[in-house]
Amino acid sequence: MSRPRRRGRDIHGVLLLDKPQGMSSNDVLQKVKRIYNANRAGHTGALDPLATGMLPICLGEATKFSQYLLDSDKRYRVIARLGQRTDTSDADGQIVQERPVTFSAEQLAAALETFRGDIEQIPSMYSALKYQGKKLYEYARQGIEVPREARPITVYELLFIRHEGDELELEVHCSKGTYIRTIIDDLGEKLGCGAHVIFLRRLAVSKYPVDRMVTLEQLRELVEQAERQDIPAAQLLDPLLMPMDSPASDYPVVNLPLTSSVYFKNGNPVRTTGVPLEGLVRVTEGDDEKFIGMGEIDDEGRVAPRRLVVEYPA
């Protein structure tokens, strides 16, 4: 007879993890899930093993709203190695071409300018995007290249930090779907020398406060501290979580009276005052404005439920 699966506890919120280098985003996710003993967990856009920085991890009911963070802006610090191109566009790949670095400061400035604003980007073969139901990196590992369509992205800000020898450091504020490795690879080709990423740190996701980031080591230390104090680890861990609706913080709020929210929570569109003309909204209820889910304004101006909170912390 097989043992019953361990369910974990109902804990809801978003942990802003400072991902360490050399670990996959999924490995980090599983460690956080175990530390919190959470019944559900999911991240909001993977970071490459080489990369460090902000990785929002959603626990419990917050996983329902992680999709809204996938659409948010990101900010990165990146260091590129000039003169070498790799098959993965980063230091984890194999060098496929080496060329001298001969561009001038003026040529660099002109090249950087072409990556600012609304541009189109062809994703790397080493990405998790799918082609005919299979991830691109699975084809790449078999030595197969498949067609990829250019996708529109926006680079809101591309800051030059330094150029020393064969290293170039930049800061990038960009829209969803932007591959920093691809920007560096494309920039290297435009400069005629090739380039690949040797350091990448995600500085920010959406409007999350950077000072709320924590490391795996800090989480483990809190667990050990709780053991020494003979208290539940949750007393020290749970205050680190951001609210479960924080992934959707960019959307306007509609507060429903309790007389209307009961219908909304049962899956029915409701009418109320002070709603926008269209689009998605965060829906709260009552005087304490408890978050109950995401809604969308329908053609009749009603708030229609889209994603509802089923469980809620007591």
UniProtKB/Swiss-Prot annotation:
The active site is at residue 48. Gene3D superfamilies: Pseudouridine synthase (3.30.2350.10), PUA domain (2.30.130.10). Substrate binds at residues 43, 76, 179, 200. CDD domains: PseudoU_synth_EcTruB, PUA_TruB_bacterial. Keywords: Isomerase, tRNA processing. It holds the Pfam family TruB_C_2. One of its GO terms (biological process) is mRNA pseudouridine synthesis. One of its GO terms (molecular function) is RNA binding. Its EC number is 5.4.99.25. It comes from the Bacteria. InterPro entries: PsdUridine_synth_cat_dom_sf, PsdUridine_synth_N, PUA-like_sf, PUA_sf, tRNA_psdUridine_synth_TruB, tRNA_sdUridine_synth_fam1_C, TruB_C. It catalyses: uridine(55) in tRNA = pseudouridine(55) in tRNA. Belongs to the pseudouridine synthase TruB family. Type 1 subfamily. Responsible for synthesis of pseudouridine from uracil-55 in the psi GC loop of transfer RNAs. HAMAP family: TruB_bact. This is tRNA pseudouridine synthase B. It comes from Citrobacter koseri (strain ATCC BAA-895 / CDC 4225-83 / SGSC4696).
